């Protein structure tokens, strides 16, 4: 109902109330047919008055209603409770005092107003006790962890040194997937599941960790992770390359522990010396090939005769390719 309609209704009711007062004071004819007609006329008069004054009163009434809606909940509760107690007590006292000579409706009205004012004043003094419990804010920010990063396990060390700020969220469907892996008959899947659960235990000791029971929309686990991270305004931590690409499409911030590890790996420079296991021969004559811990290939000139041996080599050249860095080296002096 619009505010203007409330004004019309209020003035119509005022007209009916005025008719009742005039009847009680004997200022209207007491004929039943005329009483009904006079009530109708006064109600219509009130309605017409409302139509005339409504546009002017609407703005002021809207401002008052807006102010009432902005009142703290504890003030509304205290005022309502105080008014109710005051009115109930006024009804009781009016019933008891009705037989007292000289006690009129005016006295009853004044008594009611006084009691309501008194109990509202008292209730507002204790409004802190009527304060409603504030709803727990929905979690925001932090990091959402997926299955791949838990199975990897390095996220626990990263969190332990403080590189993952904010709360860590593990969706219940990710935990369920880890449990399914841990109960698998496949030894490899079972080992992954148990490693993921062990990572969770270490994470609880390193950072605030909470299992989210929320089930976001989406059919696949990847879609649920993306929607959940977006709803929480959180970053998604994953080692899944396809999921990282989907996160960019969905506009979700994504972090990769694998990318962090690659960024922090020591960078070999020309002239550096290292021990390298020669695994196979290279494409060119007398070349041997070995690999660093991060998978980078090292081609050793004159290293073919050391196949199957770990020797000391000196880096002679480093090339950046699309798939990573490629190093060239030669056996150090004294290599056997």
Swiss-Prot record:
Domain PINc: 144-255
Membrane-spanning segments: 34-54, 75-95, 106-126
Every TRAM domain range: 267-328
Residues engaged in binding Mg(2+): 222
Keyword Magnesium found: yes
Record's keyword terms, sorted: Hydrolase, Magnesium, Membrane, Metal-binding, Nuclease, Signal, Toxin-antitoxin system, Transmembrane, Transmembrane helix
Domain of life from the UniProt record: Bacteria
Cofactor(s) needed by this chain: Mg(2+)
Membrane topology: Multi-pass membrane protein
Signal sequence, renumbered to the chain: 1-23
Family: Belongs to the PINc/VapC protein family.
Descriptive protein name: Uncharacterized PIN and TRAM-domain containing protein TTHA0540
Organism: Thermus thermophilus (strain ATCC 27634 / DSM 579 / HB8)
